[in-house]
Amino acid sequence: MSVNDVIMDAMIENNVGFVTTVPCKQLAGVIEKIEQSGKMIHVPSNREDEGMGLCAGAFMGGRRPAIIMQNTAIGVTINSLATLIQYYRIPLPMLISYRGEIGEPVACQVEMAVHTKALLDQLCIPTYHFHKEEDADELPAILNHAYMAPVSYTHLRAHETCVH
């Protein structure tokens, strides 16, 4: 089974009812499967922070949302994540392609890769990095966990730390 099929099956198994996507070469196969499936509402976004708003609306309308995006846009989504998704405790799995690793041909992608995990850690958002195709087999359990609790823990006091 392809990684795209594993991702699609995991979303169906976890009753994902709404997906927004931003164009991504690495995730183009799964985006195409979502578009063709008819099993969930798919609304392409122009920007990742716009997608956060769409996902919040879908959640408030009774659907389980997910967003598919690139890690290079984490910087522009920080405000939407903190003041919308986290503040209103919206569970939102983010399937993020990870640009900028060894072999990346685009230099600016490398710079954001250096900061991606640290930015998500700062927001207390757990991350799971798939290095091999078979790692995607964990996605159904990860999605299930993500929908049991909000995307992050927001009720922390200054002296507490994030729990992942």
Stretches found by the model and what they are:
Residues F18-E32:
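N-terminal glycine-rich anion-binding loops that anchor highly charged ligand groups
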Residues H155, E160-H164:
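Single conserved hydrophobic/aromatic residue that forms the stacking wall/gate
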Residues M1-D9, N14:
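N-terminal amphipathic/basic leader segments beginning at the initiator methionine
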Residues A28-R99:
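Thiamine diphosphate
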Residues C108-H145:
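Conserved thiamine diphosphate
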